[in-house]
From Swiss-Prot:
Coiled coil: none annotated. The modification Phosphotyrosine is found at residue 18. It comes from Candida albicans (strain SC5314 / ATCC MYA-2876) (Yeast). It is an enzyme of class 2 (transferase). This is Cyclin-dependent kinase 1.
Length: 317
């Protein structure tokens, strides 16, 4: 049985959507460095729901090079839950912020990160696990420049709160239109939409749809992709928050919104940012898209060629 006392807390390294994250040493495993995530429960008095424990237990089986490993679950008493993850000290948001403005991530780097991101998602989707809250902050990068997905499956176990632990509003910038329009049925397409938004952001060095409210987010999407209708998105009229009175915008070419991306990249992005979730490209199909044909993910030199190394980012999360 794993006990909280097996872990020696070093420092607080961040506050995520679900609670505080500490850097800690695992005394039972040669003092390996881990991330100790204390989950804040919505109703402290009711304890940890058994459904959440079941969901999280399944995540321990998710072993993939592009997914942050969940080592252990500590249910210290009926009201507290800690998740023990492998420790990675940099996320994609901080990494992008560290590169001087005017300097791109580099086409090879973007392709490498996209390949790794989609591989991780394919693995999760093949196990019927959705993320539902993908964003640059929960894409972590190791010292070799490999990208790994964090917080997969937590949305199903705990729900996606409206406000993060720090009371800041959870970002809407990567949220799929079917969720924004009040849809209650999600599919793997919600994650592929988020991947498209992250793809565009890596190319542009700024978010594609930086809305500050749900309606602002919806209208920012419409201004670029056009206002959807029944023809391009069957049954959109039945979504609770869709209004026939929405302004009618025409679709713009994505090459105008993401000018640095080549034709194959634009085609892939176009297939990710499809309104109808059933027609959105899957992770499996995305990996065989021509955009990746000239990608050699084994070439780790790309990481240093295109970019600043990450040694200087130690102790960040």
């Amino acid at each position: 049985m794993v006990e909280l006392s097996d872990y020696q807390r070093q420092e607080k390294v961040g506050e995520g959507t679900y609670g505080v994250v500490y850097k800690a040493l695992d005394t039972k495993h040669n003092n390996r460095v881990v991330a100790l995530k204390k989950i804040r429960l919505e109703s402290e008095d009711e304890g940890v729901p058994s459904t959440a424990i079941r969901e999280i237990s399944l995540l321990k089986e998710m072993k993939d090079d592009n997914i942050v490993r969940l080592y252990d679950i500590i249910h210290s008493d009926s009201h507290k839950l800690y998740l023990v993850f492998e420790f990675l000290d940099l996320d994609l948001k901080k990494y992008m912020e560290s590169i001087p403005q005017g300097v791109g991530l580099g086409a090879n780097m973007i392709k490498r990160f996209m390949n790794q991101l989609i591989r991780g998602i394919k693995h999760c989707h093949s196990h019927r696990v959705l993320h539902r809250d993908l964003k640059p902050q929960n894409l972590l990068i190791d010292k070799e420049g490999n990208l790994k997905l964090a917080d997969f499956g937590l949305a199903r176990a705990f729900g996606v709160p409206l406000r993060a632990y720090t009371h800041e509003v959870v970002t809407l910038w990567y949220r799929a239109p079917e969720i924004l329009l009040g849809g209650k049925q999600y599919s793997t397409g919600v994650d592929m939409w988020s991947v498209g938004c992250i793809f565009a952001e890596m190319c542009n060095r700024k978010p594609l749809f930086p809305g500050d409210s749900e309606i602002d987010e919806i209208f920012r999407i419409f201004r670029i992709l056009g206002t959807p209708n029944e023809e391009i998105w069957p049954d959109v009229n039945y979504l609770p928050d869709f209004k026939s009175s929405f302004p009618q915008w025409k679709k713009k070419p994505l090459s105008e919104a993401v000018p640095s991306l080549d034709a194959n990249g634009i085609d892939l992005l176009d297939q990710m940012l499809v309104y109808d979730p059933s027609r959105r490209i899957s992770a499996k199909r995305a990996l065989i898209h021509p955009y990746f044909n000239d990608n050699d993910d084994r070439d780790h030199n790309n990481y240093n060629e295109d970019n600043i190394g990450i040694d200087k980012h130690q102790n960040m999360q």
